[in-house]
């Protein structure tokens, strides 16, 4: 019983590694936004809307990883 509980906690911890990728992805998206606005300030509104879309897609991946982690902890 203790081995199954330990495996559940280890699996939940490993499944949160995807959150690191989401954080890096969001950082890259907004770094590209800053770079694009500094090169062409007239496209600020367009670039901002694209960066929000990119941030949402990157954050969705992280939320899926977090959901799997919670499912491993509380549903299995």
From Swiss-Prot:
InterPro entries: ATP_synth_F0_csu, ATP_synth_F0_csu_DDCD_BS, ATP_synth_F0_csu_sf, ATPase_proteolipid_c-like_dom, F/V-ATP_Csub_sf. The record marks 59 as: Reversibly protonated during proton transport. The keyword Oxidoreductase does not apply. It is a multi-pass membrane protein. It is found in: Mitochondrion membrane. Belongs to the ATPase C chain family. F-type ATPases have 2 components, CF(1) - the catalytic core - and CF(0) - the membrane proton channel. CF(1) has five subunits: alpha(3), beta(3), gamma(1), delta(1), epsilon(1). CF(0) has three main subunits: a, b and c. Mitochondrial membrane ATP synthase (F(1)F(0) ATP synthase or Complex V) produces ATP from ADP in the presence of a proton gradient across the membrane which is generated by electron transport complexes of the respiratory chain. F-type ATPases consist of two structural domains, F(1) - containing the extramembraneous catalytic core and F(0) - containing the membrane proton channel, linked together by a central stalk and a peripheral stalk. During catalysis, ATP synthesis in the catalytic domain of F(1) is coupled via a rotary mechanism of the central stalk subunits to proton translocation. This is ATP synthase subunit 9, mitochondrial.
